[in-house]
Design a protein with these regions (language model features):
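Bacterial N-terminal signal peptides that target proteins for export
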Residues: 1-14
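Bacterial N-terminal signal peptides
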Residues: 11-23
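C-terminal domain-boundary segment and adjacent tail
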Residues: 32, 98, 197, 202, ...
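Structural recognition of the beta-strand scaffold that forms the well-ordered cores
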Residues: 37-40, 69-72, 103-105, 173-176, ...
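Metal-dependent polysaccharide deacetylase catalytic core of the NodB/CE4 family, i.e.
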Residues: 73-183, 203-210, 264, 295-300
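Active-site-adjacent pocket scaffolds in enzyme catalytic domains
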Residues: 174-290
């Protein structure tokens, strides 16, 4: 009987250790350059998510157990009717509790959300238009958060915090606004409301993948200084863009707010081959001696349609990890990546 118990414990303890480390252990410094891989889910229109989309996200989790989700969850799921709300919430919590996922925040300027937060709803400008002048979006979806004042942004962030607290979603650490729109006012406000990480810097070029409409380029806050080769960086008080120096915007832990560039853009913009090539570009950066990161991103409502694409890319990354080839590649959440970036060398 005793040998049987020992054998059983030998099987259970490693699993317990893995789960404990995913959820509790602080990141450890890496001796050599690493390519970090983040996998972000964007909840844009949670009411439109289908059972098939949810199954696709569950399959990506199951087929790629090393992968770590950063769910950019959307509190609008609680301000208007969302058929799969309970199932979606259960999924993000389960991946957090059992697969080391992170639950962050993604905000689009929908009327129901703004009304609930006590913010006046506006319909202009739109980031999906040919020009800014005269542009509008009556749903608010394409209206950039940067259209609103710091005080109004603060109300939205506080309302989000209350929803997350009530639903057991925890204190969010990573933030990304709809269409990645960003400004210094926004970065200062997310830092003041407990966020440590921004996942918004977006490549404007078409070297790999498509690009947004002309009005987005005028309104988003990003320019050609952000590329598919961009690496995570501390956010300066002088600019949201890379390449600027201290003083930095500090989070409430008195450490700098860090930006995680969206190197692989988002699902509909890029092919599987695009993402693989960008991954290989970052392998080359690490071989030259610099730790770097890529970000893969998928919308909740197109998860089923994009499953094969991301399964293929994640399998490609998994194969590199399993091969033991250098440089080392590690999956990580965006907030944990920020902690790694700030570790002393």
């Amino acid at each position: 009987m005793f040998p049987l118990v020992v054998n059983l414990l030998s099987r259970l303890i490693p699993l317990w250790v893995v789960v404990a480390c995913l959820n509790c252990c602080p990141p450890q410094a890496d001796a050599d350059p690493v390519v970090y891989v983040t996998m972000v889910s964007h909840f844009d229109r949670p009411w439109a998510m289908t059972d098939g989309d949810l199954v696709a996200l569950e399959k990506l989790t199951r087929f790629h157990p090393r992968m770590r989700w950063t769910h950019l969850y959307n509190p609008v799921a609680y301000t208007q009717d969302t058929p799969l709300r309970e199932a979606m919430e259960r999924f993000v919590k389960q991946t957090r509790d059992h697969h080391g996922a992170e639950i962050g925040t993604h905000l689009h300027m929908y009327k129901s959300l703004l009304t609930a937060a006590g913010v006046k709803f506006v319909t202009h400008p739109s980031v999906t238009a040919e020009q800014v002048e005269g542009s509008r979006d009556d749903s608010g979806y394409a209206v950039p958060i940067t259209r609103y004042s710091r005080e109004e942004i603060g109300r939205l962030l506080e309302h989000t915090r209350k929803i997350y607290q009530e639903r057991g979603l925890g204190q969010p650490k990573t933030f990304c606004a709809g269409f990645y729109a960003t400004s210094l006012d926004l970065q200062n406000m997310i830092a003041a409301h407990g966020y440590t990480t921004s996942a918004a810097a977006f490549p404007t070029q078409t070297i790999y993948g498509a690009q947004y409409a002309p009005s987005w380029h005028a309104l988003s806050g990003w320019n050609a200084s952000v590329t598919y080769k961009s690496r995570p960086y501390r956010i300066s008080q002088a600019s949201i863009l890379p390449g600027h120096e201290a003083p930095f915007i500090n989070a409430i832990d008195k450490q700098p707010l860090v930006e995680i560039p969206q190197t692989c853009k988002i699902d509909w913009m890029v092919s599987a081959e695009d993402m693989k090539v960008i991954f290989k570009e970052h392998l080359a950066i690490a071989r030259q001696g610099a730790t770097t990161a890529i970000c893969l991103a998928i919308h909740e409502t197109s998860s089923e349609g994009n499953f094969d694409k991301f399964h293929q890319v994640l399998r490609y990354i998994d194969e590199h990890i399993h091969s033991g080839s250098q440089p080392q590649v590690k999956y990580i959440t965006t907030a944990e990546l920020r902690d790694r970036i700030l570790e002393p060398n």
